[in-house]
């Protein structure tokens, strides 16, 4: 019985750790040298614009602003919002609810 409980605890911790790792995953690290705004600053700006929990984050080339932006998926009140922050100016470029088929 003790082995079964220990196995359940280890499995739960493993699953939780996997979730935390997924939330902290970052795409676009190769573009960081081109940005003037750090990931931490961009995260703070995104959360100030739309408080919640960041579930996905990336740095990408995209039209609008200077062409380089951090994109954050933020879970809030049961919905997912996409918040874009210009990676060179720090300006919030986008703050909208995602549709039924998010990126």
Mark where each language-model region is:
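Long, terminal "pre-/pro-" and other extracytoplasmic accessory regions
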Residues: 2-103
